[in-house]
């Protein structure tokens, strides 16, 4: 295993988590904020050392082009910092979202992504209605369970037809608008909507 300083390990772990969560690497500024480095040049120095050690590859012409190379080397998160989050299959009307019959499996996530004092679940996305929000077909959204939402929140909602959908929420004068993030799709206009939760993150497997 390659010898890394704690700071280098923290940076590598953060890059991996961000790629898994969002599908693309963080910026130098985001890396600095995550590991407590105010100087971008210091972050660049650590990235250069990680590149020298063969753990990442960078494209100097693109600010976010950081490729993880140590695919066979796992960075382990201590078990006491992991939360097993239920992955919901079919959402059934009239039953709690995390009812046993709705759960397909459990997925381990770092506490930073799924705080243990909050009720969090995951849901697989089917379709391309939220692609402009960076949520793609077959992604898993990380959802904080709640029954209210603010305008502009991305939510999991149960429609009047008892169908669960992930859309951006807007409460307007005479109705509720569930807005897709895809210019080819029309909004869903409803009188009543049941909010199941607010999307707080995205998990993607890079093929």
Curated annotation (Swiss-Prot):
Give me the disulphide-bonded residues. Answer: none
Which keywords does this chain's UniProt record carry? Autocatalytic cleavage, DNA damage, DNA repair, DNA replication, DNA-binding, Hydrolase, Repressor, SOS response, Transcription, Transcription regulation
UniProt-listed Pfam families:
LexA_DNA_bind, Peptidase_S24
The GO biological-process annotations, alphabetized, read as: DNA repair; DNA replication; negative regulation of DNA-templated transcription; proteolysis; SOS response
Which residues are responsible for catalysis?
129, 167
EC numbers? 3.4.21.88
Catalytic activity of the protein: Hydrolysis of Ala-|-Gly bond in repressor LexA
Q: Which residues form a coiled coil?
A: none
Q: Which residues fall under the DNA-binding region feature?
A: 28-48
Q: What GO molecular function annotation could you give as one example from this UniProt entry? A: DNA binding
Where does the entry annotate site (Cleavage)?
93-94
Function, as annotated, reads: Represses a number of genes involved in the response to DNA damage (SOS response), including recA and lexA. In the presence of single-stranded DNA, RecA interacts with LexA causing an autocatalytic cleavage which disrupts the DNA-binding part of LexA, leading to derepression of the SOS regulon and eventually DNA repair.
The family note in this entry says: Belongs to the peptidase S24 family.
- Could you describe the subunit structure of this protein? Homodimer.
Q: What is this protein called?
A: LexA repressor
Protein source organism: Bacillus licheniformis (strain ATCC 14580 / DSM 13 / JCM 2505 / CCUG 7422 / NBRC 12200 / NCIMB 9375 / NCTC 10341 / NRRL NRS-1264 / Gibson 46)
């Amino acid at each position: 295993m390659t010898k890394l300083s704690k700071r280098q390990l923290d940076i590598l772990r953060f890059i991996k988590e961000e790629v898994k969560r969002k599908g693309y690497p963080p910026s130098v500024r985001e890396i600095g904020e995550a590991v407590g480095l105010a100087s971008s040049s210091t972050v660049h120095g650590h990235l250069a050392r990680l590149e020298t050690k063969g753990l990442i590859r960078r494209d100097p012409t693109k600010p976010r082009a950081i490729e993880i190379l140590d695919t066979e080397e796992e960075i382990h998160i201590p078990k006491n910092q992991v939360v097993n989050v239920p992955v919901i299959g079919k959402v059934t009307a009239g039953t709690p979202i995390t009812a046993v019959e709705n759960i397909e499996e459990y997925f381990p996530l770092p506490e930073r992504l799924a705080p243990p004092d909050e009720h969090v679940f995951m849901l697989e996305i089917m379709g391309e209605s939220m692609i402009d929000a960076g949520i793609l077909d077959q992604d898993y959204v990380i959802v904080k369970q709640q029954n209210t939402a603010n305008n502009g929140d991305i939510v999991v909602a149960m429609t009047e037809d008892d169908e669960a959908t992930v859309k951006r929420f807007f409460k307007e004068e005479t109705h509720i608008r569930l807005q897709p993030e895809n210019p080819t799709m029309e909004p869903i206009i409803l009188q009543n909507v049941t909010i199941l939760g607010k999307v707080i993150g995205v998990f993607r497997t890079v093929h």
